[in-house]
Amino acid sequence: MLRSGPASGPSVPTGRAMPSRRVARPPAAPELGALGSPDLSSLSLAVSRSTDELEIIDEYIKENGFGLDGGQPGPGEGLPRLVSRGAASLSTVTLGPVAPPATPPPWGCPLGRLVSPAPGPGPQPHLVITEQPKQRGMRFRYECEGRSAGSILGESSTEASKTLPAIELRDCGGLREVEVTACLVWKDWPHRVHPHSLVGKDCTDGICRVRLRPHVSPRHSFNNLGIQCVRKKEIEAAIERKIQLGIDPYNAGSLKNHQEVDMNVVRICFQASYRDQQGQMRRMDPVLSEPVYDKKSTNTSELRICRINKESGPCTGGEELYLLCDKVQKEDISVVFSRASWEGRADFSQADVHRQIAIVFKTPPYEDLEIVEPVTVNVFLQRLTDGVCSEPLPFTYLPRDHDSYGVDKKRKRGMPDVLGELNSSDPHGIESKRRKKKPAILDHFLPNHGSGPFLPPSALLPDPDFFSGTVSLPGLEPPGGPDLLDDGFAYDPTAPTLFTMLDLLPPAPPHASAVVCSGGAGAVVGETPGPEPLTLDSYQAPGPGDGGTASLVGSNMFPNHYREAAFGGGLLSPGPEAT
């Protein structure tokens, strides 16, 4: 490098030596101001090869401060923009034209927002329970029972219409598919995983998984969903297996002391998961159902009154009643009488609870003991631990009875009219006793004198054309007395008699006949050629030696087989039976 002093004058260096700043500065400033975009591009390529040009650029930057303040370009659009990285890194400086501003898209939002949506103030996708499961009436079943665990019904289920637990996805219109998972957790916080399992349709490993398309059907009902319980020695293994499968919606973990697990009550936890537009898995907040209680446990089962032996009682209380119900705990049950703002509890002890299904108690007194009309109240069972009540039954309180001994009733009856009975025509009641006498034998055949199906008394009298005397038939004697033998009794000759009715009997079969005559006795045995009417040949009045009796052949009044046509030998006189 050559030294140049003030006396050197016109001498000019001839080698490629770095010019001084005083010599190079005046011509450098106007040349750089007149540079255009093509010249700057060529200049950026020669920076690394010429140290003189680097010094010129450095001086220009120091004077104008170009690019050091980070300000935006001025009105001269298209001028080069220099970015300073420090004095030690000037070799890496590049020059180029400023890129034009990007044109906004026609839909009004940057393209990057379609790839990664930022969370906005709008509603987020979430899950709700539209039909809660029925809390009571469901029985948990063991796996060893070898049968279906039943189906959990909806809270609004009745005997006439059945409903099912249901969920709904909301604000999920932009999602293509959502997976809903249901599992069992504790009733209370922190809602750890329960050892019991869900079994039924779409259930594996104790949980239920369904896939939904919100744009098609955002609602879903869980059909044939049952609860399967485990034994106490299997609690720990069941919980560990579920945690290994990732079933822990509240991240509560397991509990070493599993004695705190309530085996008679569970909650169903519903949780939905989906993939966003970037393919990342996202989960919605878990939702818990109402507690579901085991039916077979008396501590949590449904209370029900089957029958009460009385439906009314005095308002003073103390009436003993018998109540039949489902199984209850004798130390955890109460019978309550309630109406509006009044409530009373029945009086009974644990010894009055019979085999958990019957309670003997005494009614409490009503709040107003001076009621004048019956008052109806409700009676129901109530469990003391959780306050659960049964369906009520009506009970009526009756007004107080001021005449407990019935004195007023006896006074209202009055005294008997003794004087009136003594002054009557029958003071001793003889006539009334006669009316109550037992009927005789003939009263069954001749109940009255009127017309009817019975024969009149005159039919039993003998015909005077054939009988010169009185004929007496045993048991058929005409009743004596003024009622039948007086002159006022009218005889009807057209009425059928006993003898004319005998002609209407069917013919007797052929058999031997014996005829006894008054002149002599002769036996004639022969065949009867045909039916002959019954005639009265002869008649011998009963003598003193005879018994005065006549026999009826056959049974009852009319003969089944009568002898020959002779009247005296067949009907009125005793004789041997035909053989």
UniProtKB/Swiss-Prot annotation:
Listed GO MF terms: DNA-binding transcription factor activity, RNA polymerase II-specific; identical protein binding; protein kinase binding; RNA polymerase II cis-regulatory region sequence-specific DNA binding
Gene3D superfamilies associated with the record: Immunoglobulins, Rel homology domain (RHD), DNA-binding domain
Protein name from the UniProt record: Transcription factor RelB
Record's function text: NF-kappa-B is a pleiotropic transcription factor which is present in almost all cell types and is involved in many biological processed such as inflammation, immunity, differentiation, cell growth, tumorigenesis and apoptosis. NF-kappa-B is a homo- or heterodimeric complex formed by the Rel-like domain-containing proteins RELA/p65, RELB, NFKB1/p105, NFKB1/p50, REL and NFKB2/p52. The dimers bind at kappa-B sites in the DNA of their target genes and the individual dimers have distinct preferences for different kappa-B sites that they can bind with distinguishable affinity and specificity.
Coiled coil: none
S-adenosyl-L-methionine among keywords: no
Sequence positions bearing Phosphoserine: 37, 573
Compartmental location: Nucleus; Cytoplasm, Cytoskeleton, Microtubule organizing center, Centrosome
Record region (Disordered): 1-39
Domain notes: Both N- and C-terminal domains are required for transcriptional activation.
Originating organism: Homo sapiens (Human)
Post-translational modification: Phosphorylation at 'Thr-103' and 'Ser-573' is followed by proteasomal degradation.
Main location: nucleus
UniProt-listed SUPFAM superfamilies: E set domains (SSF81296), p53-like transcription factors (SSF49417)
Record gene name: RELB
Cellular component GO terms, alphabetical: centrosome; chromatin; cytoplasm; cytosol; NF-kappaB complex; nucleoplasm; nucleus; protein-containing complex
Subunit comment: Component of the NF-kappa-B RelB-p50 complex. Component of the NF-kappa-B RelB-p52 complex. Self-associates; the interaction seems to be transient and may prevent degradation allowing for heterodimer formation with p50 or p52. Interacts with NFKB1/p50, NFKB2/p52 and NFKB2/p100. Interacts with NFKBID. Interacts with BMAL1 and the interaction is enhanced in the presence of CLOCK.
Placement of sequence motif Nuclear localization signal: 433-438
InterPro entries: Ig-like_fold, Ig_E-set, IPT_dom, IPT_NFkappaB, NFkB/Dor, p53-like_TF_DNA-bd_sf, RelB_leu_zip, RelB_RHD_N
Induction per the UniProt record: Up-regulated by mitogens and NUPR1.
Keyword DNA-binding: yes
Involvement in disorder: Immunodeficiency 53: An autosomal recessive primary immunodeficiency apparent from early infancy and resulting in recurrent infections, severe autoimmune skin disease rheumatoid arthritis, and failure to thrive. Immunologic workup shows increased CD4+/CD8+ ratio, impaired T-cell proliferative response to multiple antigen, T-cell developmental and functional defects, and impaired ability to produce specific immunoglobulins.
